[in-house]
C-alpha cells in the first residue's frame, strides 16, 4: 500500500451504474426544455448521423484575455442531418404519476422506410401497416373522427409532441433501410396552437435550421462505441498489481471482507464496457451546412479555396457528406454512422463561451486516412505536375 498513507480515492464513477448494454440503438430524450407559451411554436430536437471529425482554425473573441484576436486550432465533429419528416402527433396529460398518453393521430401517407420500423422482418411481412388507418382519410366520417381526436387534444392535453422520422434513404453511406423515429416536443404557444402547428407539418419536412441556429449550445444524446467484455483495469481504471503478483496482475487484489459474505456493488469487476447510453451537454454549433449554399462547402471568408467539407477520399468508414450537416465543437458519442439525437439545451446559457460568435478561418479537408498534406485533389495534381494544360 505504498503512497496510500492518508487517502485513497476510488477508481471509476458509480454514477453510471449499471454498466450494461443500452436497450436501444438510438439516444432517448428523457427531458425536453421548459415550455414558454409566450414564444412562438418551435421544435426542440432533431436526429443526425455521425460522419467523422476534422479540425478548424478560428480567431478567439475574448476581450481581456491573452488569447483575444489570436488564432486557435480546435477539433470538430461533422454530423449529417437530412430533413426529418413529420408523420404524427401525440398528446400527453399530466397526472400525479407523471405524463400519460392521451391519444395519437397519424398522417395519411407513410413512406416505406418508416413502415419498416414496425416490422422485425420486412421481406417476410405482409406490409399492411397503416393501410387500414389511412382509409379514414378517404371518407367523411373518418375525417370527422380525426378532427375529433385533434379537438380532444386541444381540450385535455398539456404536452404536444410530433412523431418524426429520418430520411435514411438519403444516407448513401448507410446500408440500413429502416428509418429512425422519435417524438419531438413542441414548445411555445397555447395547446391549440401547438396542435395546429403539428398538424400543418404532416407529411412535410423539417430542415435542421428550423430547430437550431449557428453559435447555439446543444445537447447530444446517443450510445457510445461498444467495447465488449473488458477487465477491471480497462473498465474501471484500477491500478495494476506488482509484477511478481501470483495468478495475474490486472485484477482487484481484494474484493471485500469475509463479512458481509457477498461482494459489494461498489467493487470494480470485469464486464461489459461501451455501448452505454450517454448525454453530453453544451456542444457549440460552429456551422450549419445547407445543401446548395456556400455554407455546405469548406470555404470561409479567409480561405476562398473551392472545396467541399468532406475530406479527400471521404470520411473513413462513412463516405461523402451530401446533405445538410452540423459542425460542432469537440467530439460526440458513438462510432461513424451512429444515429445521434440533438436537443436544445435545458439551461439558459449566460457564459461568455456560450455567447461568443464563431468566425472560422480555415477548415481542414486533407485526407484523414493517412498523413494528408493536400487540401484538394487539384492542389495534389499541381504538386506532382499532373495538371493538364
Curated annotation (Swiss-Prot):
Compositionally biased region (Basic residues): 18-31
Compartments where located: Cytoplasm
Signal peptide start-end: none
Domain of life: Eukaryota
Name of encoding gene: ARP1
Example of a GO MF term: structural constituent of ribosome
UniProt-recorded name of the protein: Large ribosomal subunit protein uL3z
Keyword set includes tRNA processing: no
GO biological process, one term: translation
InterPro entries in the record: L3_arc_euk (IPR045077), Ribosomal_L3_dom_3_arc_sf (IPR044892), Ribosomal_uL3 (IPR000597), Ribosomal_uL3_CS (IPR019926), Transl_B-barrel_sf (IPR009000)
Pfam families, A to Z: Ribosomal_L3
Residue ranges, annotated region (Disordered): 1-34
Entry's Gene Ontology cellular component terms: cytosolic large ribosomal subunit; cytosolic ribosome; nucleolus; nucleus; plant-type cell wall; plant-type vacuole; plasmodesma; vacuole
Keywords on record: Cytoplasm, Ribonucleoprotein, Ribosomal protein
Chief location bin: cytoplasm
Family in the record: Belongs to the universal ribosomal protein uL3 family.
Species assigned in the record: Arabidopsis thaliana (Mouse-ear cress)
Amino acid at each position: 500500500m505504498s503512497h496510500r498513507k492518508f487517502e485513497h480515492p476510488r477508481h471509476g464513477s458509480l454514477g453510471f451504474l449499471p454498466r450494461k448494454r443500452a436497450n436501444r440503438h438510438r439516444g432517448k430524450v428523457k427531458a425536453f426544455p421548459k415550455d414558454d407559451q409566450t414564444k412562438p411554436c418551435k421544435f426542440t430536437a432533431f436526429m443526425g448521423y455521425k460522419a467523422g471529425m476534422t479540425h478548424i482554425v478560428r480567431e478567439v473573441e475574448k476581450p481581456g484575455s491573452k488569447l483575444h484576436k489570436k488564432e486557435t486550432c480546435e477539433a470538430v465533429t461533422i454530423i449529417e442531418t437530412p430533413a426529418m419528416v413529420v408523420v404524427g402527433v401525440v398528446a400527453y396529460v399530466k397526472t400525479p404519476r407523471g405524463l400519460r398518453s392521451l391519444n395519437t393521430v397519424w398522417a395519411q401517407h407513410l413512406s416505406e422506410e418508416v413502415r419498416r420500423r414496425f416490422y422485425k422482418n420486412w421481406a417476410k411481412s405482409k406490409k399492411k401497416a397503416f393501410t387500414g388507418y389511412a382509409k379514414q382519410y378517404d371518407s367523411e366520417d373518418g375525417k370527422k373522427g380525426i378532427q375529433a381526436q385533434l379537438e380532444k387534444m386541444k381540450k385535455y392535453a398539456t404536452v404536444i409532441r410530433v412523431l418524426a422520422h429520418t430520411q435514411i434513404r438519403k444516407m448513401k453511406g448507410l446500408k440500413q433501410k429502416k428509418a429512425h423515429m422519435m417524438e419531438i416536443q413542441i414548445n411555445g404557444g397555447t395547446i391549440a396552437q401547438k396542435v395546429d402547428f403539428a398538424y400543418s407539418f404532416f407529411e412535410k419536412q423539417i430542415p435542421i435550421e428550423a430547430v437550431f441556429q449557428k453559435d447555439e449550445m446543444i445537447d447530444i444524446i446517443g450510445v457510445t462505441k461498444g467495447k465488449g467484455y473488458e477487465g477491471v483495469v480497462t473498465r474501471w481504471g484500477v491500478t495494476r498489481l506488482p509484477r511478481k503478483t501470483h495468478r495475474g496482475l490486472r485484477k482487484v487484489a481484494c474484493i471485500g471482507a469475509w463479512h458481509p459474505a457477498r461482494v459489494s456493488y461498489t467493487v470494480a469487476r470485469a464486464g461489459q464496457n461501451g455501448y452505454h447510453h450517454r448525454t453530453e451537454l453544451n456542444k457549440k454549433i460552429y456551422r450549419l451546412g445547407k445543401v446548395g449554399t456556400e455554407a455546405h462547402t469548406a470555404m470561409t471568408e479567409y480561405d476562398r479555396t473551392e472545396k467541399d467539407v468532406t475530406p479527400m477520399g471521404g470520411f473513413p468508414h462513412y463516405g461523402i457528406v451530401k446533405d445538410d450537416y452540423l459542425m460542432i465543437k469537440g467530439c460526440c458519442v458513438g462510432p461513424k454512422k451512429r444515429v445521434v439525437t440533438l436537443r436544445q439545451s435545458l439551461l439558459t446559457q449566460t457564459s461568455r463561451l456560450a455567447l461568443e460568435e464563431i468566425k472560422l478561418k480555415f477548415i481542414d479537408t486533407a485526407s484523414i486516412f493517412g498523413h494528408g498534406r493536400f487540401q484538394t485533389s487539384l492542389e495534389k495534381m499541381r504538386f506532382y505536375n499532373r495538371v493538364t494544360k
